[in-house]
Amino acid sequence: MRIALGIEYDGNGYFGWQRQAEVDSVQAQLERALSIVANEPIGVFCAGRTDAGVHATGQVVHFETNAIRNEGAWTLGVNANLPDNIAVRWVKEVDDSFHARFSATARRYRYVIYNHSFRPGILRHGVSHYHGDIDADRMHQAAQALLGEQDFTSFRAVQCQSKTPFRNVHCVNVTRQGMYVIVDIAANAFLHHMVRNIVGSLLEIGLGNQPLTWMGDLLALKDRNQAAATAKPHGLYLVDVTYPEQYQLPKLALGPLFMLD
């Protein structure tokens, strides 16, 4: 049978989602816990591979198993065998047409900036700290140039392995909640480092170092070297993955938990 899980994790201390030799990863920990509960080797497929230090509140995975277990085993049982910074949030049996990555129609990320003169002690790995005076409205206005299907070469990592730089950004919003500035962006898919590279350039606009038209200019240049530095990983969360209604997967609050939704 094929099982889908909703996963939440704190990416700090992991070398990203993907299983790698000799380093710890979220995938390796999840597969270990699932294999214990299933009493057989389990391999998982995810909706989106997050980088080192990046978090998720809405990651979705699927796996195949011959084990017959109830919902409590796949949630409470797996959680009992996971580190405290990884948690299963929901489980659902799905048909064989479902694939966590290839069935997804959209992914959504939130990047959380703590905009204050002094760095935080609490949540220091859950937010990215920037001390300058950030104009969130200015960032939001500039970000609208990203909408639609476009060539995002200027915002892809040099090591990105995607065959095409084109992605379709469905929506992007930048808002302020007190000392937090949140960049909320959804697209059909994302290039390697695309969200963090976009945030890095939006910050330059928000800090008044670049004009409102800069995002559009960067898209036209198709040159990663012309854009700003990549934003830090700690503020980034994969918060939602969209699938066709036929699969009827559970939907939870987007998170992260300390934000007002």
UniProtKB/Swiss-Prot annotation:
Reported EC number(s) for this entry are: 5.4.99.12
Q: Name one Pfam family in it.
A: PseudoU_synth_1
Q: Which UniProt keywords apply?
A: Isomerase, tRNA processing
Give the binding site residues for substrate. Answer: 109
Q: What does UniProt list as catalytic?
A: 51 (nucleophile)
Work out whether the entry's keyword set contains tRNA processing. yes
List the Gene3D superfamilies hit by this protein, alphabetically. Pseudouridine synthase I, catalytic domain, C-terminal subdomain, Pseudouridine synthase I, catalytic domain, N-terminal subdomain
Q: What is an example of a GO molecular function annotated in this UniProt entry? A: tRNA pseudouridine(38-40) synthase activity
Reactions that this protein is recorded to catalyse:
uridine(38/39/40) in tRNA = pseudouridine(38/39/40) in tRNA
Keyword rRNA-binding carried by entry: no
Please name the GO terms of the biological process aspect recorded for this protein, alphabetically: tRNA pseudouridine synthesis
InterPro entries under this entry? PsdUridine_synth_cat_dom_sf (IPR020103), PsdUridine_synth_TruA (IPR001406), PsdUridine_synth_TruA_a/b_dom (IPR020097), PsdUridine_synth_TruA_C (IPR020095), TruA/RsuA/RluB/E/F_N (IPR020094)
Catalytic class of the enzyme? isomerase
Q: Which PANTHER family match?
A: PSEUDOURIDYLATE SYNTHASE, TRNA PSEUDOURIDINE SYNTHASE-LIKE 1
Q: What does this protein do?
A: Formation of pseudouridine at positions 38, 39 and 40 in the anticodon stem and loop of transfer RNAs.
NCBIfam families, per the entry? hisT_truA
Q: Which family does it belong to?
A: Belongs to the tRNA pseudouridine synthase TruA family.
HAMAP family cross-referenced by the UniProt entry = TruA
Assembly and partners are described as:
Homodimer.
Protein name, as recorded:
tRNA pseudouridine synthase A
What is the organism field in this record?
Answer: Shewanella baltica (strain OS195)
Taxonomic lineage per UniProt? Bacteria, Pseudomonadati, Pseudomonadota, Gammaproteobacteria, Alteromonadales
